[in-house]
Amino acid sequence: MVNLANVPTDSQFQSRTTYRIRNKVIYCLDGARIGIQYETFFAGEPCEIYHCVLESKSFLEKMTVTEHTLPFFLPIREVETEHLSSNAIRFIDHLEEILQSYIDRREQVRLIKELYGNQIGELFHSLPYTLIEFTLEDFECKVTVSIRYSDLILTLPSQARVLAWPLRSAKRISAADRRAQPVPSRLSYAESALKTLSLPEAYAEIVLELPRALKQMFYSQESD
């Protein structure tokens, strides 16, 4: 659903020469100024619209960002320093990548909460959704999931860590093991799923295979 709060209403964006390139619209504004409107989507449905205005004091000077509606935690100034002085097109395109990837990560988290909220315990994420952690507690083990994205343009994690912690009340755990400090087991299949599938798809895969993985884990512990 479109968030109209980020749609520019200033008259400077009305009745101007525009160019549409994929999911962005470029406006020719007064003077040496350019307005860019970024349209974001998830699963084919429109999400937020953001805008950014670039200006140059003269045609000989480099452009700078004079206003924008991007989330404050996205590093627009760093992107400006890195790209805008040398390549305005690269700056515009890279900002589009950052915005769309942020929306993808955010909406993936929203979707697993919507679909599987009754199975998810604690859930934490950083503001740009580059760190996501949650627990699954509706099983014989407490499963902790931690995923990280090393770059703001990634929609699949660069790192994934999934650990199964035996619950002391689990039927298969012996009395001696209940008294001992629980030792977690890594769920490699779950880590692989998180790195190759979208978060909702990976979650479904993890839950589907979890009983078999836990059975193997308990069998391995009992045979040691």
Predicted regions located by residue number:
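Charged, low-complexity assembly regions of eukaryotic complex subunits
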Residues: 5-224
